[in-house]
Amino acid sequence: APQQINDIVHRTITPLIEQQKIPGMAVAVIYQGKPYYFTWGYADIAKKQPVTQQTLFELGSVSKTFTGVLGGDAIARGEIKLSDPTTKYWPELTAKQWNGITLLHLATYTAGGLPLQVPDEVKSSSDLLRFYQNWQPAWAPGTQRLYANSSIGLFGALAVKPSGLSFEQAMQTRVFQPLKLNHTWINVPPAEEKNYAWGYREGKAVHVSPGALDAKAYGVKSTIEDMARWVQSNLKPLDINEKTLQQGIQLAQSRYWQTGDMYQGLGWEMLDWPVNPDSIINGSDNKIALAARPVKAITPPTPAVRASWVHKTGATGGFGSYVAFIPEKELGIVMLANKNYPNPARVDAAWQILNALQ
C-alpha cells in the first residue's frame, strides 16, 4: 500500500488492538476506489492460525446492508413496493395492529416498537406468526425508530416472497454472485470451514447461534476481500452491469427518515459529509443506537447523496465489524475483528483513517 495509507492504518489500528485485546483483525481501506489490505493476529488462537485475506468473519448487523440492497433489488424488479402493507405478503397476519404498517416501516425500524431480538423460544414458522400477531406496538407506525432485528428481519423474509426463491437463494443469485462475492455466506459450506475464524468472548471460542430470521438480520459471514468489493459496489453502483442491483444499491442509500443528523436507509445509515466526528462516534454507542428516537419522514425519500458518510456497525457474541464509506471521495473502510468490542472505538479508528486520507 502507499506509505501514507500504511502509516495511518498501523498508527491507528495497532493501539486499538492492544487497548481492546482483539485476537485477530482484518482491515481494508478503499482509496481512490482501490482496496488495500491489512491483517493482524489470529483467526484461531488454539491452532495459531493467522488472520489472512481469506479468513471468514461473522458480520453481525452489517448483514443488514445486504438485506437492504436485496430488498432494493426486489423493488427495482417490480416485485415489491415499500409502500405495500405488510399483510399483502403475509395474509395470515390478521391482528389489527398491523393495519397501516408497510414494508418501509419494517425495513427502517419504524413499525412502532418491534423488539431488538426475536425471542429465543420462537423456532417454527407458526411460532413466528404467533409472535407477530401478539406483538403490541408502543407507537403509531412512522413516528419512532427503534433499531430491531425483528423488524428488518421480517422485511427481508417478505421481500423475497414474490420471487419464489428462499432468502439464501435470492441473496446468492441476485447479490453475491453478480458482485463476485464468492466467499460470502449465510451458511458456511464444509469446504470453507477451515477459513472460518473463531470469535472470542471472555476468552472462549464462539460462533453465532442459529435464531429466527438470523440470515436477514445478522447471519452473513465474509472475508475482508469480499467486503472491500461490497464497499466498492456501494461506492460506485453505476459500475454494476445488473440494472436492478444497481438501482437496489441506490435505493438502500436513499434517505427515508431523519433523526438528529442521521438518515435511515435500507440497512445503511447516512450522515451528511463533512461529518462531525463526535456525532458519528457517540451516535454509535449502544445507549444511543438502540434507544427509541422520534423520526421525521422524508417524503419523497432523498435519492442517495454522494456527499455522505455511509456506515453500519455489526456484532455477534464473538465478532465486531464496521463499514464506512464516502461516495464523493471514493474512500471507504472495512474493519473485521474476532471480538465484540465497543462501537465508539471502531468508529473513532475509522474516522481517524478516512479523515487523514480524504
Ranges and model annotations:
Residues A1-F38, V160, L165, Q169-T173, ...:
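Catalytic loop of the DD-peptidase/beta-lactamase superfamily, centered on the K-T-G motif
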Residues Q4, I8-P15, S61, F66, ...:
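Extracytoplasmic/secreted proteins, especially bacterial periplasmic and envelope-associated proteins
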Residues I5, V9, T55, L82, ...:
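Residue-level signature of the cytosolic catalytic core of signaling kinases
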Residues E18-A26, A46-L106, P137-S151, A215-Y218, ...:
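Short active-site loop at a secondary-structure junction
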Residues Y36, K47-Q49, P115-Q117, P277-D278:
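Short, solvent-exposed loop/turn elements at domain surfaces
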Residues F38-W40, L116-E121, I186-P190, A345-V347:
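Short, solvent-exposed loop/turn and secondary-structure capping segments
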Residues A46, S126-A138, G199-L213, P300-A307:
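The feature captures the short pre-catalytic strand/loop hairpin that immediately precedes
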Residues E58-V62, A74-L114, V118, N134-Q136, ...:
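Active-site helix/loop module of the DD-peptidase/beta-lactamase fold
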